Structure formats: structure tokens, C-alpha cells
Swiss-Prot record:
It comes from Arabidopsis thaliana (Mouse-ear cress). SUPFAM superfamilies: F-box domain, Galactose oxidase, central domain. Pfam families: F-box, FBA_1. Coiled coil: none annotated. It comes from the Eukaryota. Residues 1-47 form the F-box domain. InterPro entries: F-box-assoc_dom_typ1, F-box-assoc_interact_dom, F-box-like_dom_sf, F-box_dom, Gal_Oxase/kelch_b-propeller, SCF_F-box_component. This is F-box protein At2g17830.
Length: 394
């Protein structure tokens, strides 16, 4: 009787192609032949294409969630109106620290680009790790000097698909000899060279709040930014090909008229090529969701309003006001709803909540579990798998 490892490569590839992409990591440990095939670039590309086709047909889709300082690849099903589900995928709920061989449960931020996740730890050293959850690959990245709690990060790639990480710090600090001293640092890490370099020609007249998370679309990262000496707000993009920031990009709403710092503005993506923006007014609690029709480092065009929600139309027992440094969201285009993640702070125990909001007053609140840490808000970002490999360092 033939055993699997003796089968011809073409037949073995056909069999393994039927294995769910998320299970490939377990397959690698079966034998060397399976391990080699599962890492073959053409095989992986085929797997990714099939996985995306299945996802389009399925009622479920996948997102990345961060809860209690852990990162989860999560399956979402919103088509059951009675009991929508957010289910962590068992083998991909966390990753191992290569140095210490234990699960990492101290992630403070996570960013997605091209199937890769950039995770920032909250330990004293603020370490960086890049993770491909499907392939179980990680790379821990050492700083050029040191990391800081106020650092802002982004992950992207240039026109040649070379992946890079941007670290920026633009803050004011009080020192005895130099009160309100400004520290402005911009650095780029290259996966190809495994090294950092300083970006020199940057002297911005704008700033980004440390709690405003960047969003990567088509390899470049976008932020909600504010003029340094005024109240003008806009988007700014870092182009990983030119390694420069682009011009100010327009918001879909009037960012100067009665705008306050308690208004909520947060970014998300739709698929791999569209930018989405959530705006909630602190004064009226009106929520608007906009989606781009065109997005690149020098130009952003906005489609018509995707969804506008008047708080008075929602049957809820208290004001639905998202926290300025939380309120992460994603759009389910099939169901035509927006799902916003936040924390219920009105109960004795803090609970992570998913608020499903649609047109004509459609609203549903889903309890996603207790939050053990008051300082950790549930974060979510869209996830699209890819065949990008994290080259292991020797």
C-alpha cells in the first residue's frame, strides 16, 4: 500500500490543495516532503487564490482581533441575525516568542499589510515582531537605538514588493534644561537588508496622535493628521516606494466646522484596495461611514456616504459613544453593515462589545467577552491572506 509521502508530487499537491489554508502549519510537521511542498511559492499562490474564492462564496470571513493583549485570527459570521458569531481559529490564536518559546500575551498594537501583521509588545523594550498567521512565521526586529511608548508604526511595501516598517516619533517632552523640547525622528526598516535607516528630509507641519492608528492600502499607509498650529484635519500618506510623505489629502466631511478633539475618526479598509473612514460627532453622536473610490499617496476620492446613523434611530438604553482611541471597525459589504468594536464601560466588569449597525435603524450588540485589562481596548482590522514569506534570518 502506498503511503502519502511516496505519492507523486502532482498528486500530493492536489491532495494538499484541499487542506484548509489555516491547517497548513500542522501539515508541515508531518514529513519533510510535505513541508517542502507546503512552502512552494506556486503551490501557496494557488492555495491563496482558492482561499479567497471560498471566502467570497462563504457567509463567513476573517478579521484580526486584539483582545487582552493577544492577537487572534477570527472567523466572523454576521448572517445569523439571532446569534452573530466571532470565533477564534484554534491553531492561530497566538504566536510564539522565538527566543523564549512561550505565547506572546503582551501585544499593545497590531497592524496589517499584505497578509503580514506587525505587532508591538508592551514590555519595557517595546519589541517589534512581524507575523504571518497562516504560515506560522515570525521575525523579531531589533531597534536601531531604542523604542518608545509614543512611537507610531506602519508596515508597507514598495513597487518591487519589498516590505518595510516605518517608525516615527514627533512629540514634545519637558526637560529641566530645555522645556518643551521637540523630538522628531523618522526611521525605516527594510526586510531585505534587516537594517534601519534614518529618513532625513522630513520636517512636517502636522502631527499624528499616538492613538490614531495608520491603515495600509496597496502598500502605503494613511493616517488621520492635524495641522500643528491650527485646527485643520486631513489625511496624510507615507509612500513606501519614494520613502516620503505625500500632500494633505481631503476628508469626506468638513473637518474644521465645529470639530472637537472628542470627535471620533478612525480608518479601516474594504478588501485590499479601498479605504474606509468612520466619523462620529461628539456633539450629536451622529455616525458616518465613508468609502473611497480612488486612493493613492497623492489623491483620495470619496464615494457617496456608505452609511449614516442617527443615534436617535437606535433603540439603545444609553448613549452609544465610541472612545476616541478605540472604535475600530470593519465593513461587511454582503450584509451592508458596519461592525464597530469598543468596550462597555458601564458595567462592573468591562466587556468587549461588537456593535453591528446598518440602515433603517438596524442595530445589534454582541458581547465578545470580558476584558481583563482596563487599558486594553478590543481592536480589529480586516485580513486578507497572501503568499508572502517572511525570510528567516541566518
Amino acid at each position: 500500500m502506498a503511503i502519502m509521502s511516496d505519492l507523486p508530487r502532482d498528486l500530493l499537491a492536489e491532495i494538499l490543495s484541499r487542506v484548509p489554508l489555516a491547517s497548513l502549519r500542522s501539515v508541515r510537521f508531518t514529513c519533510k516532503k510535505w513541508n517542502d511542498l507546503s512552502k512552494d511559492r506556486s503551490f501557496l499562490k494557488k492555495q491563496i487564490v482558492e482561499a479567497k474564492k471560498k471566502q467570497l462564496k462563504s457567509k463567513e470571513f476573517e478579521v484580526i482581533m486584539m483582545r487582552n493583549f493577544r492577537v487572534y485570527l477570527t472567523s466572523v459570521d454576521l448572517h445569523n441575525d439571532v446569534n452573530p458569531s466571532f470565533t477564534p481559529k484554534g491553531t492561530l490564536t497566538s504566536f510564539s516568542d522565538d527566543a523564549n518559546q512561550h505565547q506572546v500575551d503582551n501585544v499593545s498594537s497590531v497592524f496589517h499589510c499584505d497578509g503580514l501583521l506587525l505587532c508591538i509588545t508592551k514590555d519595557l523594550n517595546f519589541r517589534l515582531v512581524v507575523w504571518n498567521p497562516y504560515f506560522g512565521q515570525t521575525r523579531w526586529i531589533q531597534p536601531r537605538n531604542s523604542y518608545h511608548i509614543k512611537d507610531i508604526y506602519a508596515i508597507g511595501y514598495d513597487e518591487n514588493k519589498n516590505h518595510k516598517i516605518l517608525r516615527l516619533k514627533d512629540q514634545y517632552y519637558d526637560y529641566d534644561s530645555h522645556p518643551r523640547a521637540r523630538i522628531c525622528e523618522f526611521e525605516l526598516y527594510s526586510f531585505e537588508s534587516n537594517s534601519w535607516k534614518v529618513v532625513l528630509d522630513v520636517s512636517p507641519d502636522w502631527y499624528i496622535h499616538s492613538y490614531h492608528r495608520g491603515l495600509s492600502v496597496k502598500g502605503n499607509t494613511y493616517w488621520y493628521a492635524t495641522e500643528k498650529h491650527g485646527y485643520v484635519n486631513f489625511l496624510i500618506c507615507f509612500d513606501f516606494t519614494t520613502e516620503k510623505f505625500g500632500p494633505r489629502l481631503p476628508l469626506p466631511f468638513n473637518a474644521t466646522e465645529s470639530f472637537t478633539y472628542d470627535d471620533v475618526v478612525t480608518l479601516s479598509s474594504v478588501g485590499e484596495e479601498q479605504l474606509a473612514l468612520l466619523f462620529q460627532s461628539d456633539a450629536t453622536l451622529m455616525m458616518e461611514i465613508w468609502v473611497t473610490s480612488k486612493v493613492d499617496p497623492t489623491e483620495v476620492l470619496w464615494n457617496k456616504l456608505f452609511l449614516a446613523v442617527d443615534h436617535d434611530m437606535i433603540e439603545f438604553d444609553y448613549e452609544l459613544k465610541f472612545v476616541a482611541d478605540a472604535g475600530s471597525f470593519f465593513i461587511d459589504q454582503k450584509k451592508n453593515v458596519v461592525v464597530v468594536f469598543d468596550k462597555d464601560m458601564n458595567e462592573h466588569t468591562h466587556r468587549g462589545m461588537a456593535y453591528i449597525v446598518g440602515k433603517n435603524g438596524y442595530f445589534k450588540r454582541v458581547d465578545i467577552g470580558e476584558e481583563a485589562y482596563t487599558s486594553c481596548f478590543p481592536l480589529v482590522c480586516s485580513y486578507v491572506p497572501s503568499s508572502v514569506q517572511i525570510r528567516q534570518l541566518t
